[in-house]
């Protein structure tokens, strides 16, 4: 699960328990539920993108995200996706050089990579790579509409279900501040003079610096 900038309050956890652990920066992963490993089955494939905007959430955060019932009772395969979020997935470092030109879209690149993996491998789990439906709720719905507009995702899914959620503004909610202003302020907060030093900072320290300088 991608590390989270903010954790839920104890009261919130009592009302709606979440599963946000274990957390790690290397969070790109898939969960797959199927009732038969038959390469000839060609079952419809459902790919779930979790809510939480672009800052929080996980593919297994709620009990309702468990795909066992669909795999047992339905005739389809369920895949759920973890990807980079918040500053790991969407901090814009592009003003600081070619190396970072796609940094503000890393989370979406993870989603496309997940769909590519599904396209290339889901037949081994009994799925049909030409019958893939992506769906999501709240922030997950936003991701579905985004993926419909990303050229590199063309052909990796055939249908999309938006279960609430629409994208407006930038993923980190930086408002009018651009990448240069925010990242420069973060480096000042951390006492750095070179953007490459951000790559050496543990996530909690990086998130704390961002929280201090973000809108």
PLM features per residue range, with description:
Residues 1-21:
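Surface-exposed, low-complexity/disordered Ser/Thr/Gly/Pro/Asn-rich loops and linkers
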Residues 159, 167-168, 193, 197-215:
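Substrate-gating cap/lid region and adjacent catalytic-acid/histidine neighborhood
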Residues 15-195:
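Serine-hydrolase-like catalytic core of hydrolytic proteins
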Residues 11-12, 183-186, 206, 210:
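Generic structural signal of hydrophobic/aromatic residues within well-ordered alpha-helices
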């Amino acid at each position: 699960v991608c590390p989270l900038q903010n954790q839920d309050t104890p009261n919130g956890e009592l009302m709606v328990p979440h599963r946000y652990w274990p957390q790690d920066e290397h969070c790109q992963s898939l969960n797959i539920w199927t009732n038969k490993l038959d390469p000839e089955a060609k079952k419809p494939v459902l790919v779930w993108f979790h809510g939480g905007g672009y800052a929080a959430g996980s593919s297994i955060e709620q009990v309702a995200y468990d795909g066992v019932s669909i795999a047992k009772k339905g005739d389809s395969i369920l895949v759920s996706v973890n990807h980079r979020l918040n500053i790991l997935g969407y901090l814009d470092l592009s003003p600081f050089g070619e190396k970072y030109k796609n940094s503000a879209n890393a989370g979406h690149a993870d989603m496309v990579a997940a769909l590519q993996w599904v396209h290339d491998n889901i037949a081994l789990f009994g799925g049909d790579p030409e019958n893939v439906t992506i769906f999501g709720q709240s922030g997950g719905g936003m991701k579905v509409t985004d993926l419909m507009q990303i050229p590199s995702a063309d052909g990796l899914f055939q249908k999309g279900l938006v279960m609430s959620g629409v994208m407006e503004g930038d993923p980190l909610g930086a408002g009018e501040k651009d990448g240069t202003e925010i990242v420069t302020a973060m480096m000042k907060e951390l006492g750095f003079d070179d953007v490459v030093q951000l790559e050496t900072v543990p996530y909690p320290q990086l998130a704390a610096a961002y929280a201090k300088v973000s809108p």
